[in-house]
């Protein structure tokens, strides 16, 4: 089987990671003790992608939990599925990273990283044929961002030919823990551009807006935001966990989704949007799902796809429905909105259907878009970064851990380059002979 090793780092990474395991364990019929109580062979057919089978027929997540302080991991251990995880796979320090990227990447995190790599090695060795790694983390803090990106580069060194996927939570002033989030996020993106194959950008701004506007929650909690994240992660990984033809492993997903190696930041979406506890009471139709799925309000990244163009798209429909209708609706969307899909990648929308719907829904749709509009998210962080960096505000916390200002400047320009690359391909047409001479024409 093609196995995936899952790593969760930092407070946010551990919280969304724990939710992810709750949701997929439920979908595969695995209870908190690791015992299977399912009702369909489909649940077990590809169970080995995420679970090891232990003695006594128990299923154990192939998950590694990392943090620089014990708090969050204690709550995961005490949570509903806390006993499911392998006890040796909890690796934590005591000092904390204090929301400081440099502590996670260069000092505190660097001391713990070898312990983590030992467990990564052990998990990888027990795999039959490892396809790659997935990391859940946030970019705004210290551990998930700093140590998370350190882990990525170390794993990359040791497993250069395996796929590296991240679910990265991007900070937003609307749901902010710390004033230095733009620094931490920019330093992280600088790493992700170079060292990951696929990054799902989960944007706290978008999650907050969905909870507030669509779900009418006046004061969304992290629990509400994480409910959306776990639904999205479950949808995105459906093709990896259940039998099917399309995007059935991380590499095939990357091949379909990433036309240029640096442009691998995806905008996820989900339909129908439901709040925790109140699953939708009316069944949706395929046209409604399709329409909702492409709607800007359903995107988990606060970017408007109408401000850019799609390079590639993958859609995953779940539930019992007519394949013919799904294909018709997807073609319909593309024909009606063909201006929003680059014309120099024909057939750039791929669709998969899985029979097993998520709990509480008859059918759902998950959207993965590689849109040039994601540049809006990087621009937002870049502006916040520049505002502080030009005054050198808070820099002493980073230089005190041995960082150089130069590294900040490099990270800033790498992210700005990324924005211009997205812009360049947004404006490119089939006729353009050479992409190099951009800048001659402004956007209409």
UniProtKB/Swiss-Prot annotation:
Keywords: Cytoplasm, Cytoskeleton, GTP-binding, Magnesium, Metal-binding, Microtubule, Nucleotide-binding. Its cofactor is Mg(2+). Transmembrane segments: none annotated. Signal peptide: none annotated. It is found in: Cytoplasm, Cytoskeleton. It holds the Pfam family Tubulin. Mg(2+) binds at residue 69. GO terms for molecular function: GTP binding; GTPase activity; metal ion binding; structural constituent of cytoskeleton. One of its GO terms (cellular component) is microtubule. InterPro entries: Beta-tubulin_BS, Beta_tubulin, Tub_FtsZ_C, Tubulin, Tubulin/FtsZ-like_C, Tubulin/FtsZ_2-layer-sand-dom, Tubulin/FtsZ_GTPase_sf, Tubulin_C. GO terms for biological process: microtubule-based process. GTP binds at residues 11, 69, 138, 142-144, 204, 226. Dimer of alpha and beta chains. A typical microtubule is a hollow water-filled tube with an outer diameter of 25 nm and an inner diameter of 15 nM. Alpha-beta heterodimers associate head-to-tail to form protofilaments running lengthwise along the microtubule wall with the beta-tubulin subunit facing the microtubule plus end conferring a structural polarity. Microtubules usually have 13 protofilaments but different protofilament numbers can be found in some organisms and specialized cells. Tubulin is the major constituent of microtubules, a cylinder consisting of laterally associated linear protofilaments composed of alpha- and beta-tubulin heterodimers. Microtubules grow by the addition of GTP-tubulin dimers to the microtubule end, where a stabilizing cap forms. Below the cap, tubulin dimers are in GDP-bound state, owing to GTPase activity of alpha-tubulin. Belongs to the tubulin family. This is Tubulin beta chain. It comes from Trichuris trichiura. The lineage of its organism: Eukaryota, Metazoa, Ecdysozoa, Nematoda, Enoplea.
